[in-house]
Curated annotation (Swiss-Prot):
It is a peripheral membrane protein. The modification Phosphotyrosine is found at residue 331. Residues 145-249 form the IRS-type PTB domain. Belongs to the DOK family. Type A subfamily. Residues 247-260 have a biased composition (Polar residues). CDD domains: PH_DOK1_2_3 (cd14676), PTB_DOK1_DOK2_DOK3 (cd01203). This is Docking protein 3.
Length: 426
């Protein structure tokens, strides 16, 4: 209920039939409030100066809005009620002549209620120009650290296993993500960035998947925070900074790279498999094998076919004539090679016969000759060799067509040097 600022008995002057009279009233001054405007309320008063019954005086109440007041001030009159002084109140609708025992107090209260609010409004309008357009500073967050984000843990299987629920503080430190207690700021869980498989953000949700080597174990953790985008950018920046710092080889990585890895070390794709196989036995202090930087291996040429390998090994023995391109494989070497002197051909034929002799069929085998296997460790036979003239002591062997003997001798000698397996003859 509103309380009046000023309450008392005053007199109002009336003119009736050209004669001025004073009528006693009770006046109350109310200031502007959420319940009403600044005003003066008048009630009829009896001779003893008290207000009559409210139910009877409701119809006799008069209201003067002080917002319509134009001027207030004292005035001198010849006749006023006893022990009173006159003052005037001018509004936009009517002029009032009033008298009161405490005239100065009534004038002061009327001026304060009627003109003080207008004066303040005029001063603000005269001195206050239009506000200068300003932009919000997105970096203004001095009340908390930029790397700490208040989060709400959402229920997941990993969060339930770690008994996480409620509000926490997630700090994106240079080397790890740390979950702290919201009250005591004590670190509860730590996830190093190398142990995070993946992370992401969607509106007000930040989520990441932890690996098996982290303190919390394998699983997905989801947090709700209004600064999810900022948190995701902070984690990405920290990972990028840490990755740039690892471009130079670390001492621990160098020590591991010098260890013999076995046959799998030749294949660069074997490193991730080896890291996954031994991840459970390595402690958290050892760096992940996936982080080791192996030097790039130059791609090797595709393995050639068998006869192409044989041809490369025997090309110095079969050189084409000047101006002709090198042959591609063995068969071209054999059939396109330039014939050599007869003495050399006969020597090769003798050597082919000796090598065939070392490859006789095993005991109990019915075939004439077995599959030719290398016999380099066999001792050299002490038999008579061909003379330079193509003859030897003793009975002469029946002659054969030389082109066929030359071709067979070359085939046997070439294949015996490279030692092809049984799969090359299938």
């Amino acid at each position: 209920m509103e309380r009046p600022v000023k309450d008392g008995i005053i007199y109002v002057q009336h003119c009736k039939f050209g004669k001025r009279t004073w009528r006693k009233i009770r006046a109350q001054l109310f200031a502007a409030s959420p319940f009403g405007v600044a005003r003066m309320e008048k009630f009829d008063a009896r001779d003893h100066g008290t207000v009559s019954d409210i139910s009877l005086q409701r119809c006799a109440r008069r209201v003067i809005r002080l917002s319509d007041c134009v001027s207030v001030g004292p005035m001198g009159t010849e006749s006023c009620p006893k022990a009173t002084a006159a003052f005037y109140l001018t509004t936009t609708e009517k002029n009032y002549v009033l008298a009161a025992e405490q005239r100065d107090e009534w004038i002061e209260q009327l001026c304060q209620l009627a003109f003080q609010g207008k004066k303040e409004a005029e001063q603000s309008s005269s001195t206050g120009l239009q506000p200068i357009p300003m932009e919000e500073n997105c970096l203004y967050s001095s009340w908390q650290d930029l790397t700490e984000f208040p989060v709400l843990v959402l229920r997941t299987e990993a969060a339930a296993r770690c008994e996480l629920h409620g509000h926490y503080v997630l700090a994106a430190l240079p080397h790890s993500l740390t979950l702290k207690d919201a009250q005591s700021q004590q670190p509860l869980l730590t996830w190093p960035y190398p142990f995070l498989r993946k992370f992401g953000q969607d509106q007000n949700i930040f989520s990441f998947e932890a690996g098996r080597r982290s303190d919390s174990g394998e699983g997905t953790f989801t947090f709700s925070t209004p600064r999810a985008a900022e948190l995701c950018r902070a984690v990405a920046a920290a990972i990028a900074c840490q990755q740039q710092g690892q471009e130079s080889p670390q001492p621990s990585a160098q020590g591991l790279s010098n260890q013999p890895w076995g046959a799998e070390a030749e294949d660069p794709q074997c490193s991730p498999t080896l890291g996954r196989a031994h991840s459970g036995s390595h402690s958290a202090s050892y760096p992940s094998l996936n982080l080791l930087r192996f030097p790039p291996v130059e791609p090797e040429a595709p393995a050639p076919i068998v006869y192409a390998s044989i041809a490369r090994g025997q090309q110095p023995h079969f050189r084409p004539c000047p101006g002709q391109p090198l042959p591609e494989h063995l068969y071209e070497n054999i059939f396109t090679a330039q014939p050599r002197p007869l003495a050399e051909e006969e020597a090769e034929e003798e050597e082919g016969r000796w090598e065939l002799g070392c490859r006789q069929a095993p005991e109990g085998h019915s075939s004439e000759a077995a599959v030719p296997y290398p016999a380099r460790s066999a001792p050299q036979p002490h038999t008579q060799r061909w003379a330079p003239g193509g003859s030897r002591g003793g009975a002469e062997e029946p002659s054969r067509p030389k082109p066929q003997r030359t071709l067979r001798a070359k085939l046997v000698r070439l294949l015996s040097r490279d030692g092809p397996g049984a799969r090359d003859w299938s």
